[in-house]
Design a protein with these regions (language model features):
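Catalytic core of nucleotidyl cyclases, primarily class III adenylyl/guanylyl cyclases
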Residues: 43-65, 79-106
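Short amphipathic alpha-helices in soluble, non-transmembrane regions
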Residues: 69-75
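Short Cys/His-rich "knuckle" micro-motifs
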Residues: 181-184, 207-208
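Short linker/helix segments within small regulatory modules
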Residues: 184-192
Length: 227
């Protein structure tokens, strides 16, 4: 039998970059940490239903509980050193539960919304906002109408407004959060760049120098053509 539930799909932003840079063991350790954090963020009847890669699917019969869970996730991951930013999608609608699996377009749309959300943000459908009992928990910023693959019609989407108390610093190579810059590796020439390790600094310099060298070659070739 179908019933209405709230769904949150929450992904780690930059997980592929982290895996590529620091390897499978570091990636697996990060997932273990993500699960521990998520377990401590659950509100009310919210529960983790399943994990696929770096995405966790949360479900609740009450949208207010799931929104509170999402806010906890953002707050706890933002302050976690050497972690990744999180992004997610929230939706409310009918699903079919069979052998502890959920089926229906509600699941698909929640996943599609999560895929569009930028790092450090949660986006939600108008159905989710309308289903909230207490809409004063936080503000919602309209992101306009969106089309989603394999979803009929346009959907009005909102961003959950989360007040940022500090500037978010991110390692440009592995995408890890730099919570305490005083303990990170500071780029000697670019003031705004911090790295989790000398490995990432060296990788950045290698890539940057390679791009700079290519640009110089292009400029030289263009100059020869003009002459």
């Amino acid at each position: 039998m179908e019933k209405n539930i709230a769904i949150l799909m929450a992904d780690l932003s930059g997980y592929s970059a982290l895996t590529e840079t620091h390897g499978a063991t570091s990636a697996a350790d990060l997932i273990d940490k993500y699960i521990r954090i998520a377990e401590n963020c659950l509100v009310g009847d919210s529960k983790m239903h399943q994990r696929t890669g770096d995405e966790i699917m949360f479900v609740s019969d009450y949208p207010d509980f799931l929104l509170a869970t999402a806010l906890n996730l953002e707050a706890n991951t933002t302050n976690e050193e050497n972690f990744l930013q999180i992004h997610g999608g929230l939706h409310f609608g009918k699903v079919l539960n069979r052998t502890d699996s959920y089926f229906g377009s509600t699941v698909n749309l929640a996943s599609r919304i999560a895929a569009k959300a930028l790092a450090g943000t949660f986006w939600c459908s108008d159905d989710f906002v309308k289903s909230l009992t207490n809409k004063s928990i936080c503000a919602f910023k309209s992101k306009g109408s969106h089309l989603f693959k394999n979803i009929n019609g346009q959907k009005e989407i909102y961003e959950v407004s989360i007040e940022k108390t500090t500037t978010t610093l991110v390692d440009p190579i592995c995408r890890m959060l730099i919570v305490n810059p005083q303990y990170a590796i500071h780029h000697p020439n670019e003031n705004e760049l911090y790295f989790c390790s000398t490995q990432c600094l060296e990788e950045y310099n290698k890539n940057h120098n390679s791009v700079h060298y290519t640009e110089m070659l292009d400029q030289s070739e263009n100059q020869l053509i003009l002459n």
